A protein has these predicted regions:
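Short acidic (Asp/Glu) and glycine-rich catalytic loops that position anionic groups and cofactors
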Residues: 263-268, 314-320, 344-352, 444-447, ...
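N-terminal export/assembly segments and adjacent metallocofactor-ligating motifs
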Residues: 2-294, 318, 323, 331, ...
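Extended redox/cofactor-interaction regions of prokaryotic respiratory oxidoreductases
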Residues: 179-245, 249-253, 258, 282-285, ...
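N-terminal leader/propeptide and maturation segments of large enzyme subunits in energy/redox metabolism
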Residues: 118-145, 149, 159, 289, ...
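Flexible glycine/proline-rich, aromatic-decorated loop/lid segments
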Residues: 261-264, 483-517
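Long, contiguous, secondary-structure-rich segments that constitute the structural scaffold
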Residues: 530-592, 710-728, 732-818
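Short beta-alpha connecting loops at secondary-structure transitions
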Residues: 269-275, 500, 513-523
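Active-site phosphate/pyrophosphate-binding segments
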Residues: 287, 307-429
Length: 818
């Protein structure tokens, strides 16, 4: 704990409740930057601990006030750029004047910490039958009993050469390295994370074009912001987004949002363009047609830094605005005007997220949108899509022993590498659960470890997921609530909140920044922190590295045997920090202002022009104008750079050609998960589920600042903001159907039906209905239970065939009175 002695003025700034409105969209808590000086010390004292939030994946910096061991308030960390801006000059020059912010979820974390419905002790299932509505007949057991039973099951798999039959599912931002280390040392290739439920289609789209999977929007310096299916002013991926977009608009930018639903972001845009779900790629191709037809593209950038432009130009020759209008319902004149405005306004930025991505055609649609940035030279320049210099802690890879290596050679159960040419390392949840339910796949898994994941509510295809979990011999869930997924478990062990544990957070800004998550209070039920739980399992199983290193006992800094698991983990983190960009220990990070490491390098632009060192170039293999690194045996390995006109060797983009790629002939050599060749071009094809006479409406879902996925609906403070999720129906559509506000209706697809409450709006495409994702719990807690509607039963458990992205937004329904 860090004790600060503050002036009265600073105390009021930091500890007072200051609620402001960012862009008029959602309530954010803001505080002015506080600089503590020895000369300002007075008798006013308070204890603050700097940390990082984990109420969502944004990982905002937080400052927690603790009194007598109890958390009483959460404020934004005034030192963390993630709470302010993704551009370094903006942060350094303006944060002290404006102050930082956190979203409602971050401010409400205290309610989750002290939720009366939290799990307190391990539970063991007494009823072997599993399913929705089945009473598990829980029996409370001790931690020792839980460890013994879980270890016995794990040991049985490993001793029988079946370690690969363990499936491990983890949340993305919490103690992931120790979990993946455990899986590798145990011998299972089946470590998976949440990402493939979120934005892996976007990742694949941008990687195919620019070579990296997460460029960041520089809205602050842009003059034209074009967003496809993204709601950053409310579904705040990072808490700095509302501010930089607002400041960009104040600085003269026009914002245009393409979305079937009038989201908070669309509401604040100068123009909202409603579109048929899953047709965004067609609109992007038509825009490309106009930009090329009118010669509005950046000729120099395309000549020097792209490949395949001619083939793309030929492909979009007939992709006219009139062609796209028939597909999207967006008027041809609107498409033409937006294309011209976008290309003519410098600098401009275009971005796409989960709205278009979570369809069967999401990757190619996103790729068509990403190419719009290339057409206008909007890559890694101020006001465009930036390549983040994302450096932080370094994961120190472990070396598994001979026993583990045997089973690590088995295929992943989800067949990530074999089936999904642009799959993400997070795995393919939908493939795994579909095969598990149907008895397919390369082998039959026997056990699952599910950490901080409510899979029953978050994976599409509820009935499939239910059957899949029931088909496993043994399921362990580690969570803070008795969730719907926990009800399918054989043993449930209570976890901790982010306010009770450590983590390192490499922040998604454009220059290197790393924030520390550290315990604000001790685990309130005396339960082990998740990394202690994993460490204890590793110790009981006797897992070691190939050289015999007793890795779960030996400290990574001291090399000495450490019994205290928290101290052991502190050395684990220190080693990652020392080997990574910060080059410091955990204690040194704690001592920095706000417990956040902020690189002085700042945001850099046009990094594709960075020179390759003469030494690196001399040790490379040149083929044509591309430099390749060497394998240990001297053979050609990966491309590392590009020889440009004049003979200079530069980094280029991280694609095979080291240029932005409109076209890649090698894609045709790959097949997607459905057995089809991958098109070298960003082709448009209709999504594979369309409305018909029986199910005439598109159903979509979205997220808002009020809740995170399916995990915050028991948070009393957030439920005050958003208690449920009515079905939003266009007023014209509702009139035709005879529906009014607050009517109870059935929403039915070919897979099932759910009951919902109607809310009429003009802000919805008339062929579309939709609701906020995350509600409709039958477990989790007293507040969450029976509030709102879940739509997971309405969709199949299905993944996009290129990236493995779960298809959350592709659904056709009929709506009728209940």
């Amino acid at each position: 704990m860090k004790t600060k002695t503050l002036t009265r003025k600073e105390f009021l700034k930091l500890a007072g409740v200051a609620v402001g409105t960012v862009s008029g969209v959602a309530k954010f808590v803001s505080t002015a930057q506080a600089k503590i000086k020895e000369s300002e010390l007075t008798q006013v004292k308070s204890d603050f601990i700097y940390s990082c939030c984990n109420m969502c994946g944004g990982q905002s910096g937080i400052m927690c006030r603790v009194v007598n061991g109890k958390l009483v308030k959460i404020d934004p960390n005034p030192y963390n750029p993630n709470n302010f801006s993704n551009i370094s000059t903006d942060f350094f020059e303006n944060v002290e004047k404006e102050g930082t912010c956190i979203c409602p979820k971050g401010n409400a974390g205290i309610s989750t910490l002290y939720d009366k419905d939290r799990l307190q002790k391990p539970l063991k299932r007494a009823n072997p039958k599993k399913g929705i509505g089945v009473d598990p007949r829980w029996k409370e057991i001790s931690w020792e009993e839980a460890y013994v039973e879980i270890t016995k099951r794990l040991k049985g798999l490993r001793d029988n050469g079946e370690a690969h039959k363990l499936l491990w599912f983890s949340e993305d931002h919490s103690f992931t390295h120790i979990q993946s280390d455990f899986c590798k040392l145990f011998g299972t290739p089946n470590y998976s994370m949440h990402s493939n439920l979120c934005d892996t289609a976007r990742k694949a789209s941008f990687k195919m074009v620019m070579g990296l999977d997460r460029p960041l929007m520089d809205a602050l310096q842009s003059k034209y912001i074009l967003l496809f299916g993204w709601n950053p002013l409310s579904a705040t991926k990072w808490s700095h987004l509302p501010r930089i977009i607002t400041r960009g608009i104040e600085n003269g930018a026009k914002m245009v949002v393409v979305d079937p639903y009038l989201s908070y972001t669309a509401n604040k845009a100068q123009e909202w363009i409603p579109i048929i779900p899953g047709t965004d790629g067609a609109m992007a191709l038509a825009m490309g047609h106009v930009i090329i037809r009118d010669k509005l593209y950046d000729e120099i950038f395309i000549k020097d830094w792209t490949i395949g432009f001619e083939k793309y130009a030929e492909y979009v020759k007939d992709k006219t605005p009139q062609w796209a209008e028939k597909i999207t319902t967006v008027p041809a004149k609107t498409i033409e005007r937006i294309a011209i405005e976008f290309a003519a306004t410098k600098p401009q930025v275009v971005d796409v997220w989960s709205g278009p991505g979570q369809h069967s055609n999401g990757v190619q649609g996103g790729r068509a949108i990403a190419i719009l940035a290339a057409l206008v030279g909007g890559c890694d320049r101020p006001g465009t899509l930036l390549i983040p210099d994302n450096k932080g802690n370094k994961h120190i890879e472990v070396e598994p022993d001979e026993i583990a290596n045997k089973t690590l050679k088995e295929k992943r159960f989800d067949q990530l590498k074999e089936l999904y040419p642009f799959g993400h390392k997070s795995g393919i949840y939908c493939q795994a659960f579909s095969d598990l339910a149907e008895g397919k796949g390369p082998y039959k898994p026997k056990m699952a470890m599910i950490v901080f994941q409510n899979i029953m509510m978050s994976v599409p295809g509820l009935k499939t997921v239910e059957k899949a979990l029931a088909n496993l011999e043994f399921v362990v869930v580690n969570d803070i609530f008795l969730s719907e997924t926990a009800l399918m478990a054989d043993i449930v062990v209570p976890g901790t909140t982010y306010l009770e544990r450590y983590d390192l957070n490499t922040h998604w800004v454009t220059w290197p920044v790393l924030g520390l998550r550290q315990p604000v209070v001790k685990p309130i039920f005396g339960q082990p922190v998740e990394y202690e739980f994993v460490t204890e399992l590793g110790r009981r199983l006797g897992l070691k590295e190939a050289d015999g290193n007793d890795i779960f006992w030996v400290g990574r800094m001291s090399g000495e045997r450490i019994a205290d698991k928290t101290k052991w983990y502190e050395e684990f983190l220190s080693k990652e920090l020392k080997e990574g960009a910060p080059k410091m220990t955990l204690e040194e990070l704690k001592a920095l202002p706000g417990a956040v490491w902020v690189s002085k390098s700042g945001t850099r632009y046009e990094k594709y022009k960075d020179a390759i060192s003469p030494e690196k170039l001399a040790d490379s293999i040149l083929e044509g104008n591309i430099a390749y690194s060497k394998k240990p045996d001297g053979a050609k390995d990966k491309p590392i750079g590009l020889i440009i006109e004049g003979g200079a060797a530069v980094h280029g983009f991280s694609t095979p050609s080291r240029k932005v790629e409109f076209y890649n002939a090698d894609f045709a050599k790959k097949k997607d998960a459905w057995g089809r060749p991958v098109d070298p071009l960003p082709v448009y094809e209709p999504r594979d589920w369309q409305p018909d006479a029986n199910y005439p409406l598109y159903l979509i879902n979205w997220k808002e600042a009020s809740h995170t996925h399916t995990r915050t609906q028991n948070n009393a403070l957030l439920v005050e903001l958003k208690p449920d999720n009515p079905l939003m129906v266009n007023v014209v559509t509702a009139e035709k159907m005879g529906l009014n506000n607050d009517d109870l209706v059935w929403v039915e697809s070919i897979y099932g039906r759910v009951k919902a409450k109607v809310k009429l709006t003009k802000g919805m495409h008339p062929e579309v209905v939709g609701l906020q994702h995350g509600f409709g719990h039958w477990a989790l807690g007293e507040i969450a239970k029976d509030a709102g509607t879940s739509d997971t039963v309405l969709r199949p458990c299905k993944a996009d065939p290129l990236s493995g992205q779960a298809i959350h937004k592709q659904c056709c329904v009929k709506v009728y009175k209940a």
